[in-house]
Amino acid sequence: MTTLSVFLDVPLAQKLEGSLLKTYKQDSCPKKIFLAFRVCQTSKGQPWVSSVVPKMRLQIAQDPSLNYEYLPVNGMRSFTEASLKLLFGKHNQVIVENRVGGVHTVGDNGAFQLGAQFLKIWRKDSQTVFIMSSKKEPYGLVFQDMGFTVREYSFWDSKQLCMDANVLLKQAPHDSIFVIGNICDCNLTQSQWATLMASLKNKRIFLFFDISSQGLSTGDLEKDTGFLQYFVSQGFEFFCSQSLSKTFGIYDEGVGILVVVALNNELLLCVLSQLMKLTQALWLNPPITGARIITSILCNPALQEEWKQSLKGLVENIMLIKEKVKEKLRLLGTPGSWDHITDQNGSHSYLGLNIQQVEYLVRKKHIYLPKNSRINFTCINAHNIDYITQSINEAVLSTKGLD
Amino acid sequence: MTTLSVFLDVPLAQKLEGSLLKTYKQDSCPKKIFLAFRVCQTSKGQPWVSSVVPKMRLQIAQDPSLNYEYLPVNGMRSFTEASLKLLFGKHNQVIVENRVGGVHTVGDNGAFQLGAQFLKIWRKDSQTVFIMSSKKEPYGLVFQDMGFTVREYSFWDSKQLCMDANVLLKQAPHDSIFVIGNICDCNLTQSQWATLMASLKNKRIFLFFDISSQGLSTGDLEKDTGFLQYFVSQGFEFFCSQSLSKTFGIYDEGVGILVVVALNNELLLCVLSQLMKLTQALWLNPPITGARIITSILCNPALQEEWKQSLKGLVENIMLIKEKVKEKLRLLGTPGSWDHITDQNGSHSYLGLNIQQVEYLVRKKHIYLPKNSRINFTCINAHNIDYITQSINEAVLSTKGLD
């Protein structure tokens, strides 16, 4: 066939994600361990699922009253409402004043895709986006593809081994966009908060929060997102990607909400109407299963309580693992203080190792973790904790004095 | 509060879709009928669902062996494979030669969103898109938002009351993109096909097929998409949006595939790799439920057979409704030939009324249908067929001589 291909100029795209996981999978060593799974693992190394979810899946499948019609473009309204109440608390100022709203989004990136499209059109002056380094790969790509300049930042101070929100003040130019994850881990004082807020306002920085694991930090749903209320009370307008897949264990049904907080209801309706237009072009009608499971649980007090308890159990287990790791390192006499392990909240925290130590673990011990040593602590269990802590000890000893 | 809103310049977006449905809903007349639902209706006016689907939903919810982990970026591989086999037939040339592939997409617009993004980047010369008028609203918006010039066309010849594929030849400028639905309804002769193909090649027109109801035209899955094989055999490269929600009755789980046919495997892999990159930014991991239900049915011969039979039953019912409408109009002595009703395949077909007649039905009879008189015949049932046919008769008589 002599026809020239239409696709002649299309090169093979570079793979962006999963190189660490790929190397892990190709490793034939039986001792190999992967410490960077995105989702929480059970003690048996399976993805964690809230006990209430399988029950709800069954109940939904057996319900003859459900209809399987298309959802409207803005998605499942009861899902959006229940999720916003979860995020802000039922009686929050923005809910009472009717100036918070949300659009049902698809997948882990959906809310960022939608929000970025909006910002590209309606905030032409904001073309630089700062993204926390741990999320640069999935979210950065979204903004990059649309022509934004993407820079990364980290709250983690690898010298002081603690979180530091001052990076926000130092790095951000005027009119930039900031994608912010769990800022409550930074433990700011009242006056530090005030300085931060003033600086953000002064620089006209647009905040795009990323709440993908509400409740997984402290085990307390309200406490985890309390800082959002503070921003609301200070008159900030912002976007927030609220993802609920991780906290229910419905990873296969990536579902979320692009939350919009505006100064008043009129502005909110304008923003939502533009978002709806974009959603229509993106996927028209979002799939329902994830939203249906979550809504059924959130709207039933008994099931909601069961879910909260399962989440609490997960967080207690994370704390226990961290305590054990710290204790084992202490018993091994590993140089350094390991308090930073238990000082950090949530499933994903920094081990506080340097690059040489990480390399040592990967190459000599077949323990796979990212270069910044931010690991998923739920990947550590009774079967592998001794091997992991002994290996960390070896890594630290072998690289002593190399800094 | 004196702060100026970030969203100050954002106007309220115009609503694009559903104005007919909205007017219908606001109509308080008890006789009102809506003839333009997107999905097939049962004789009781409920959305049609294949009998095999509820069973499969239950089976999936009860299966303890399933894992709920994230799907990879390219989606569920077994779903893509099973769907491609359905589209092309197991032993088709493109499958054997390994030059067809697909990406699991989300919602009814997902495949067009993904395909349009690709074409925007990799076919910079193709900036005009022709879309069949019945699908202009959902798909046109996708291309329009990305800066393409969108024009509409229709195979329906409202004078001759038949389908005419020659519009493709007349209207299309060089290097344009054509979104094509069910071309097999045009009943082209071998020589007309040959002329059409030569002209498309000569004008370097890129084809983007829309297969959203395979099997619903003739009741025969292979026959409905046979024309795709003809394009393949003639050395065409193309995209195809394959949507399976309508043919299974899983409207709430909008799921599909962006199908790519390339001249060889190497080209295919390049295109798929670029699509994967775009998918990552769009939704990262697609939701699984719709794909899981469909794959479980397609990969089980007994269930597949049950699904095919349910589809056949649906198509037979559509034909029966059309026959009845034609017969009732004949008995009423309605002027004109109504053969075009039964000459057209599928649930959605043209009634062949002019604008005055449509207006008459909407305003005087509370029967809601689009201006081009393309209706969903499954909205007609034993309860409303007499009222509908009598009203059509009145409409035709009352506007006689107005043309």
Predicted regions and their residues:
Chain A
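Eukaryotic N-terminal low-complexity, Ser/Thr- and Lys/Arg-rich leader segments
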Residues: 1-13, 309, 397-403
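N-terminal "arm"/small-domain region of PLP-dependent enzymes with the aminotransferase-like
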Residues: 2-85, 89, 281, 287, ...
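Active-site PLP attachment segment
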Residues: 224-270, 274
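Conserved PLP-binding catalytic core of the aspartate aminotransferase-like
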Residues: 306-364
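Conserved core of the PLP fold type I
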Residues: 49, 54-204, 215-216, 221-229, ...
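Structural signature of PLP-dependent enzymes
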Residues: 272-291, 297-326
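Hydrophobic beta-strand scaffold residues
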Residues: 35, 150, 207, 238, ...
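Glycine-centered flexible beta-alpha turn that most often forms the glycine-rich phosphate-binding loop
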Residues: 210
